Amino acid sequence: MEPKTKKQRSLYIPYAGPVLLEFPLLNKGSAFSMEERRNFNLLGLLPEVVETIEEQAERAWIQYQGFKTEIDKHIYLRNIQDTNETLFYRLVNNHLDEMMPVIYTPTVGAACERFSEIYRRSRGVFISYQNRHNMDDILQNVPNHNIKVIVVTDGERILGLGDQGIGGMGIPIGKLSLYTACGGISPAYTLPVVLDVGTNNQQLLNDPLYMGWRNPRITDDEYYEFVDEFIQAVKQRWPDVLLQFEDFAQKNAMPLLNRYRNEICSFNDDIQGTAAVTVGTLIAASRAAGGQLSEKKIVFLGAGSAGCGIAEMIIAQTPREGLSEEAARQKVFMVDRFGLLTDKMPNLLPFQTKLVQKRENLSDWDTDSDVLSLLDVVRNVKPDILIGVSGQTGLFTEEIIREMHKHCPRPIVMPLSNPTSRVEATPQDIIAWTEGNALVATGSPFNPVVWKDKIYPIAQCNNAFIFPGIGLGVIASGASRITDEMLMSASETLAQYSPLVLNGEGLVLPELKDIQKVSRAIAFAVGKMAQQQGVAVKTSAEALQQAIDDNFWQAEYRDYRRTSI
């Protein structure tokens, strides 16, 4: 359902003069009316012509096109965001296909690596270990009192790039930009946070420009006590906030999620968001290929928290299609750098133990090796689906893909590793190796593939199809927790919007131009499930939809009225 056009009420503000022009959430630049210029002491501080936001956006678009590199475009857009947020979101929404890869993956990876070099202006909150005893004061310094969504990182596992220290702040900033651009959550309600617990990246420690705490990362009890102090301070300041954990290292991601998911409304996008969008993609791809997800045999390359999170959500989904959990687990095969996870493998992580295969059941496999490689697994399992979350480039070789296609006429191949430089195989190669028969979805954006004069659109399995809708649904419903069932309802809703399923052709995921519509539908499904699960107050469907409409922010200037401080 499209948002209803609503008349914006006037906004009463106490700021005036240059202070108002320096306030990104309120600045209109050349769009201040003559009356506003008189009332807010802006006469003579702006050029004579009063422009519309579309005229401003057109000028910004022309300027944007003048930049030749993606990182320069990223810096330019961040500068607009830090001076006029409403214009920033109007511009991004006007050119979402072009700009999403620039404000987020893959370009944000380079921005994180060069954070201290390209730093212009502070955005968000930096909480260093040195300031751990000032946590409450730091959060009180945040000027926006009604924060509803926080994205927090400690910068240790940024995309596939590893430890970026406080450079990881680029991820919460980019993620929250998508909460607004795709999910309609007002930027005034969002807060990016980086927990500066040091860095083990020697290059950063040796960099004279590095702006973070120059110290090796704290670990173990010190680390968990610091994170706990942060969580308690957030609960004290904003008890109803949605907290998203982002790009924490594997050793910390799952423990933190498990520790806090029932204490504060929180989720981990790398684990749960990635799982939700992947499951939604797989449901749609399975229907397009013929059949249900529960019928498919699935091989994962990468058995970290993200891969195992996806696998567990697939297993949780299959009972909806009539398959038992035990039977579902027998269809999922996890491969890491040591080979297939089996019950005879030592040193498994806790979240891996439920995803092993019994070695005794593999005695008839065609292999001469004790270590069961990805090729061994593909040859013997004959999977329908191959998912890459390894963070290592080139591991889906021609031999592996051709072996898969030999037994599966319509293989589903998903190299999900980010950024583009880490992808397990390129869509071009996968399409060629399967004679144009593979359904391909990637983690990073790729151009359509042309093979034998036919165009193959490549879907980006982008978490932005999921987390903005979840955030909007949580805010609109007032949900106090995010349950697995809420995530599964988001996946199912996403699958319902697949052009390939609806029309028999096109992308397996919706086009970006439809992302706000999809986010609103996901918000409704998530809010409804939250009510059914008892983590939100029950209302009518009409009331929930109205709450979504009321909370859906759009990049339009409001009329300003002067008030005293």
From Swiss-Prot:
Pfam families: malic, Malic_M. GO terms for molecular function: malate dehydrogenase (decarboxylating) (NAD+) activity; metal ion binding; NAD binding; oxaloacetate decarboxylase activity. It catalyses: (S)-malate + NAD(+) = pyruvate + CO2 + NADH; oxaloacetate + H(+) = pyruvate + CO2. Its cofactor is Mg(2+); Mn(2+). Gene3D superfamilies: Malic enzyme, N-terminal domain (3.40.50.10380), NAD(P)-binding Rossmann-like Domain (3.40.50.720). GO terms for cellular component: cytosol. Its EC number is 1.1.1.38. The keyword Metal-binding applies. The active site is at Y104 (proton donor), K175 (proton acceptor). It is an enzyme of class 1 (oxidoreductase). InterPro entries: Aminoacid_DH-like_N_sf, Malic_enzyme_CS, Malic_N_dom, Malic_N_dom_sf, Malic_NAD-bd, Malic_OxRdtase, NAD(P)-bd_dom_sf, NAD_malic_enz_proteobac. GO terms for biological process: malate metabolic process. A divalent metal cation binds at E246, D247, D270. The record marks D270 as: Important for activity. NAD(+) binds at R157, D270, N418. Keywords: Metal-binding, NAD, Oxidoreductase. Divalent metal cations. Prefers magnesium or manganese. Homotetramer. Belongs to the malic enzymes family. This is NAD-dependent malic enzyme. It comes from Shigella sonnei (strain Ss046). The lineage of its organism: Bacteria, Pseudomonadati, Pseudomonadota, Gammaproteobacteria, Enterobacterales.
